[in-house]
Amino acid sequence: MIPRHLAFPISAAVILFLPGSGSLYARQNGPQASDASTTWTAPDPATIPEGPLGDSIRLGLEVFNDTPKFAAPYVGNRMSCGHCHLKSGTAPYAIPVVGVPGLFPMYRDREKEVVTLEERIEQCFQRSESGHRLPNNSREMVGLVAYAQWLSKDQVTGRPFPGRGLAKLPELSGDANRGSHVYAQQCAVCHGPEGAGQPPSIPALWGPDAYSDGAGMNEIGKMAAFVQHNMPETNPGSLTPQQAYDVAAYVHSKPHQRFDIKEHK
């Protein structure tokens, strides 16, 4: 039996694997009609093999879902990978990690260099989890890569499928004042009136336990796309694009840890 904390949970709102300018597949892949040739079903955690490889995959899943607990030396807040890559990286339009190993090595404009999957994961720990780089041979890094590869085992490299990346929204201007009302009505019940969340299950949205200002989720457009399709968790997709932009602007206006690469080596 798979322990409960290894099951694919539905999380609440750190963008991890973010090639290109920010999100995993940016926002060019909005919701579309299902195509039998490109549909994908998440593998059952019960099928993770026994033995050393399976142990590494299971550790990677644990790190993914409760990063501060299972990768504590490398984390500087209370964010987990699964807070943005929902359902353990399997939820459509919640930046699923399936297929990610096949995208690397990749050239990234921000770094102006080709980076490996391990380097990209390190950047996520630095920016989204306000932490430090993991050694490539650490149990935690090997586990995360093993989990991503296992999750992608039935996905043809480079083949598109519905649900990748984030939902495509029109480009709008968010209003933090309007967003404060949306937040109070739709978000505060889970994330709290002061954005503190309920870690580890529900993430903080601002303050010392939330992502830094160097994280992908700190970009209003990306957060709006994530929120509109996935939140509130009890009624996802119920917010209009404008409401999503407004609440993203409100969260963006709140304090976040300042990201300085020199402090997160």
Locate predicted features.
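Extracytoplasmic electron-transfer domains, predominantly the class I c-type cytochrome c fold
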Residues: 35, 52-59, 63, 91-134, ...
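A structural motif
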Residues: 114-118, 148-160, 189-199, 216-223
